[in-house]
């Protein structure tokens, strides 16, 4: 379910409202200036053909767009035929997330397009996101309009280089739920950036397309969760059930609505449903009281979320509240024994010359890496256009787009209510929508660049989550070292990585998502799991093998967490090129014989994954299995194809039986790796709308039935990685972070180690002796007898 987060909220716009430009500092193109560069067209078709143009001319042409006056007065012509409009230079990169202004205009445009007042009044806005343009548009922007300003990114044409005068308008995609009709629709709005003499800078929207999507339910919104909790707590039979359990103060009661999933026809998307879980806090005067320590069980509630009515209620079984746990809380001063550690000294991260990264809008450069940062309500952090600056070979692409597109959490207890706890946290709630405002010194350390995120709320207003994405450098221990044993001379380098991250809360759990970029060309994807266990209550003397007893009457069910990373790769591929393939590598043991007389031989065997059905693969640690994405037309100095390999970390597969109900919607969990040929609209492994989805195997499992060829293609990797959580007492009351992830590592991509040119550490052999630890600096133990007992 959704959670409260720090936001700045703007009111819902009316259809006629005007908003500020997304980039108010950008220059205005004069009407006269357009003639100097070309007649401005409506899209990519209006380009100026230049059959032969050298690099100097290209720079001159592209700089002409950026060097126009910023203080040019507006026209004072006030014709009665309409407001005078002046074309603006492109101010937002085609991959930049929608600004607050763009979201407001998109919402207002859709609301104004409603056919009747009833339709307009019933509109609720689930999601407003950028329609990501074709890769050729991205190449165009990166060549002439925005960093890295590299015209070599443009595909070669017979007519020579082409310099455009403008980029096509940005577009927004809206998922709209109509609360009155229970219909879900998708809208596409074109956002034209204009400037009007009377109203100042703003956007103008135009509906390009709209359609109603039948037989689906979109994600549940945070406002719906809050309303659902209030409806349940005010329901008289529910209040009676609480009194039967000795709960008179309803302010102590927590109602966490969960999506119902799809277990039978009763869960069909013809109704918008939620089945809440109920908990009870012990104290009301503690703002961080751990209410999850006392689950209230034996009560069945089904809520019609569309009409906010309880349609089914049953007090099935009186399960006593678990006893009050003195170890339930985790805030400072309320931990075990009520004493916090006193021997933790300050640790400061100091960069006296500032960071090594450079930021231009959403464009990031660091240690030969460059990429763009995006963000969506569903996925959260998105990394675009990943490339590496490789000396004379220039900017070499690695991936078009990297993101986490889904996560599924199935529980292993067959008893009610735990058997129906199968959360799709991205598709049913939204990872980005539940992201936090991060705090300096707590979530990130060092010299930090934050990025805000803008969303629509349920009624169409704009909400801003400040400091939503954190970007910073981290020391990461040793990068490489060698000491010559003959001379005693040594060379050592310390590793540094650039980390981009965000953190979200979904009900009781926290998930922190990271993309790490390393100096040796490696990219690491990491998820950190923490938060509070989802617990169950037990009858006196009861024991369940499907979980871990926390204390008598309270237990934590076993469960699994699965994450799906979607990676549209581009190893040495310019936008528009489709020259990648995937090979699987298994290390084989040589059979004894004349080729293996010493019985010690083993070797790596490669298998080309030729089609999508062949590319449904699982991890195999016994053969050190990994997969390499290679460019079919680029070689290294040995003549081998350049590539990047996916190296699995610890992983698992679903432990539920093959007929488990949640696998109807999560068939993609049946394999660790899927490979598909890129196709627009194939974005989420369980389909666009997994909430209450009755269709078996929608999404990835259906797409691969086309069995498209992969031998030379635009490749998308879908890597599913999971963890099986058998709870420990040490996971209570709040879980220490659990790490899970994988690595993308260069494999024949470079001609040698890209990390050999990292300079020696600045502090090597120059550390002050004052930093050496002596016996006198060792802190005395502060353990008390009470702490020792606990």
UniProtKB/Swiss-Prot annotation:
GO terms for biological process: alkaloid metabolic process; amine metabolic process; nicotine biosynthetic process; response to auxin; response to jasmonic acid. GO terms for molecular function: aliphatic amine oxidase activity; copper ion binding; diamine oxidase activity; identical protein binding; primary methylamine oxidase activity; protein homodimerization activity; quinone binding. It is found in: Peroxisome. The record marks 788-790 as: Microbody targeting signal. Its main location: other. The modification 2',4',5'-topaquinone is found at residue 509. The keyword NAD does not apply. The keyword Oxidoreductase applies. Mn(2+) binds at residues 714-715. This is N-methylputrescine oxidase 1, peroxisomal. The gene is MPO1.
């Amino acid at each position: 379910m959704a959670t409260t987060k720090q936001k700045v909220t703007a009111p819902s716009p009316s259809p006629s409202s005007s908003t500020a430009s997304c980039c108010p500092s950008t220059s205005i193109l004069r009407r006269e200036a357009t003639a100097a560069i070309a007649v401005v067209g409506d899209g990519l078709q209006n380009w100026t053909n230049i059959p032969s143009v050298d690099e100097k001319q290209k720079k001159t042409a592209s700089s002409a767009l950026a060097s126009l006056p910023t203080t040019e007065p507006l026209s004072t012509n006030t014709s009665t035929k309409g407001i005078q409009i002046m074309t603006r230079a492109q101010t937002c990169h085609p991959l930049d997330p929608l600004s607050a202004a763009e979201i407001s205009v998109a919402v207002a445009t859709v609301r104004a397009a409603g056919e009747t007042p009833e339709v307009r009044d019933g509109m609720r806005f689930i999601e407003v996101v950028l329609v990501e343009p074709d890769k050729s548009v991205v190449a165009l922007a990166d060549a002439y309009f925005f960093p890295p300003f590299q015209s070599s990114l443009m595909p070669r044409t017979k007519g020579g280089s082409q310099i455009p005068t403008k980029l096509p308008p940005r577009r927004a995609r809206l998922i709209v739920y109509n609360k009155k009709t229970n219909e879900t629709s998708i809208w596409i709005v074109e956002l034209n950036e204009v400037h009007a003499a009377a109203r100042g800078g703003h956007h103008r929207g135009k509906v390009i397309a709209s359609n109603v999507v039948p037989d689906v339910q979109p994600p549940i919104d945070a406002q719906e969760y809050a309303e659902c909790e209030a409806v349940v707590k005010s329901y008289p039979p529910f209040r009676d059930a609480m009194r039967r359990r000795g709960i008179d103060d309803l302010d102590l009661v927590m109602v966490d609505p969960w999506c119902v999933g799809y277990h039978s026809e009763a869960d069909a998307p013809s109704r918008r449903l939620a089945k809440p879980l109920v908990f009870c806090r012990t104290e009301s005067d503690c703002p961080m009281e751990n209410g999850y320590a006392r689950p209230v069980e034996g009560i069945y509630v089904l809520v019609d979320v569309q009409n906010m009515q309880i349609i089914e209620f049953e007090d099935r079984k009186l399960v006593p509240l678990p006893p009050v746990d003195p170890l339930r809380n985790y805030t400072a001063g309320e931990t075990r024994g009520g004493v916090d550690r006193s021997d933790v000294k300050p640790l400061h991260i100091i960069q006296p010359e500032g960071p090594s990264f450079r930021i231009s809008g959403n464009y990031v450069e660091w240690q030969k890496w460059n990429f763009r940062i995006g963000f969506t309500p569903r996925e959260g952090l998105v990394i675009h256009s990943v490339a590496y600056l490789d000396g004379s070979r220039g900017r070499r692409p690695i991936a078009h787009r990297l993101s986490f597109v889904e996560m599924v959490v199935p529980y292993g207890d067959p008893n009610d209510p735990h058997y129906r706890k199968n959360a799709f946290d991205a598709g049913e709630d939204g990872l980005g929508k539940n992201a936090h405002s991060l705090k300096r010194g707590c979530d990130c350390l060092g010299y930090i660049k934050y990025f805000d995120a803008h969303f629509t709320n349920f009624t169409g207003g704009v909400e801003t989550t400040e400091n939503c994405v954190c970007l910073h450098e981290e020391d990461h221990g040793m990068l490489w070292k060698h000491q010559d044993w003959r001379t005693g001379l040594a060379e050592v380098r310390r590793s540094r990585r650039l980390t981009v991250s965000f953190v979200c809360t979904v009900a009781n759990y926290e998930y922190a998502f990271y993309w790490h970029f390393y100096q040796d060309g490696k990219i690491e994807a990491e998820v950190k799991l923490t938060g509070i266990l989802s617990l169950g209550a037990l009858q006196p003397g009861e024991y369940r093998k499907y979980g871990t007893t926390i204390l008598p009457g309270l237990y934590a069910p076993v469960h699994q967490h699965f994450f799906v990373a979607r990676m549209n790769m581009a190893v040495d591929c310019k936008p528009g090129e489709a020259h990648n393939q995937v090979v699987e590598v298994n290390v084989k043991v040589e059979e004894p014989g004349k080729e293996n007389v010493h019985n010690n031989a083993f070797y790596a065997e490669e298998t080309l994954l030729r089609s999508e059905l062949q590319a449904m693969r699982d991890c195999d640690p016994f053969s050190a299995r990994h997969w390499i994405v290679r460019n079919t037309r680029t070689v290294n100095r040995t003549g081998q194809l350049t590539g990047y390999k996916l190296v699995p970390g610890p992983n698992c597969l679903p432990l539920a039986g093959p007929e488990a109900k949640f696998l109807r919607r999560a068939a993609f969990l049946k394999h660790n790796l899927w490979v598909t040929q890129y196709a627009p609209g194939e974005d989420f492994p369980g389909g666009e709308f997994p909430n209450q989805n009755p269709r078996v195997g929608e999404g990835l499992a259906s797409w691969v039935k086309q069995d498209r060829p992969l031998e030379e293609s635009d490749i998308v990797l879908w890597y599913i990685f999971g963890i099986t959580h058998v709870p420990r007492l040490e996971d209570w009351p709040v879980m220490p972070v659990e790490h899970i992830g994988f690595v993308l590592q260069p494999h024949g991509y470079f001609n040698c180690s890209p990390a050999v040119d990292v300079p020696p550490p600045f502090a090597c052999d120059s550390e002050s002796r004052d930093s050496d630890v002596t016996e006198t600096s060792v802190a005395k133990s502060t353990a008390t007898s009470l702490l020792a007992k606990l």
